[in-house]
């Protein structure tokens, strides 16, 4: 929630508070109350009640974990650029890519724990026996699906392992130490949309899988029913040190492998995007304001690739500085429809 400073002063006058409570705040400070007066709070839809003992803790899967410390890493949280517009400087080289509305996935070929047989344990008394090996891991945004040996991958939120489907398409391109971060878009094997809003699917041009009475199956094909867009690539060495591919390297690697990266909308100096802006006069604020309404990036417009009339989600900005960070700018039109959808319990 963003409140103009003039409106904040009027509110302070209304409740009888001095303006001094905010005059010493630094730019970028986040707060939801002033002197115990609540300004705003996040609206959370109450989830439907479920039967059974809600206090019972979910059983943890048993088995041998594959994970080696500092080898597999989840994706970092993308920061709202409106919270920190000053991070982009006019002379920064930036990448702007389209933000699609799907589900996040990760595929990696990293060092994993190697289960030792009794022969290995005996041999370890006399010589060094490796206890790690390179192996595949795949995950959703927060859950590794094949973390344990001899365990089936979890179906997860959608009731089917869409992440395993995506991983099977990407694993042939993985080399030792490589991790791919991507968005899965389109449809699920069940025929449901990966993402929908107010009853309309974010199909991104993919066809809904249909039951075939001849084969008694529902054919599900990569490139026809669902797609994968890669937005980040890292290399992790045996010591756990991570090398981050630049935005340009991600685009080039995908091109070389015949895979699809996120759509790159702009690459170059930030100042050249809007050369009419004065760098000495509130350049950062004006830059973000221009960006938020730029039709070249489909801002505040319908998705350019979906068959359905659904709002474009927004854009992602990366600064080419070698750091593991990215910034997002969502369309107000998308956020408004998302709020309506959440209110309906979708």
Residue ranges and their predicted role:
Residues 1-346:
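Core nucleotide-handling region used for phosphoryl-transfer chemistry
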